[in-house]
């Protein structure tokens, strides 16, 4: 995708910084993900992501679930005395037109923009140590959600889920 196209999508969100560059981030198989680097040192960088609506047909429900989960985790962290929330929980930016955290293009693509979490890493290869650390992190995540006070919607339907994912990627 062209830099100018990505820049125009970023401009649909309430970003207060000047964008310097936008480049691919990671090598995900499902969503298209880009790092949005800002010029100002006191402003965060961002992650721009095009959600694969072939895999996640109800994109609005995905974002509702994320809002519920991130709000709950944020409240739990505050109650525990955590002050550095930016490095512990996702923060999505609203669009400039409304408070929606999704931008829908005319051609049916959905985009979201979140604050980049500094020092976050992704592993392309798994070794026992990173698998153990991932398991611990996932267990901590599950513990944080143990008392979430609502029912989350199902993001990917159970029927032919695997087949749909493989077709979409």
Regions found by a protein language model. Name each.
Residues 20-164:
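Conserved ATP-binding subdomain of kinase catalytic cores across diverse folds
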Residues 165-169:
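Hydrophobic alpha-helical segments, chiefly the membrane-spanning helices
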Residues 1-24, 69, 73:
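Juxta-kinase regulatory segment immediately upstream of eukaryotic protein kinase catalytic domains
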């Amino acid at each position: 995708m062209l830099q100018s196209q990505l820049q125009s999508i970023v401009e649909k969100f309430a970003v207060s910084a000047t964008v310097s560059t936008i480049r691919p981030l990671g090598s995900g198989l499902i969503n298209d993900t880009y790092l949005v680097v800002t010029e100002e040192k006191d402003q965060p960088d961002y992650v721009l992501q095009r959600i694969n609506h072939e895999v996640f047909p109800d994109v609005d429900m995905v974002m509702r679930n994320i809002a519920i989960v991130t709000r709950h985790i944020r409240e739990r962290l505050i109650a525990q005395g955590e002050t550095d929330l930016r490095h512990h929980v996702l923060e999505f930016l609203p669009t400039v037109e409304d408070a929606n955290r999704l931008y829908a293009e005319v051609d049916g693509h959905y985009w979201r923009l979140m604050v980049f979490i500094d020092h976050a890493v992704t592993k392309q290869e798994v070794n026992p140590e990173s698998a153990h650390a991932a398991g611990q992190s996932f267990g901590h995540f599950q513990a944080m959600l143990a008392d979430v006070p609502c029912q989350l919607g199902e993001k990917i339907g159970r029927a032919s889920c695997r087949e749909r994912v493989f077709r979409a990627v």
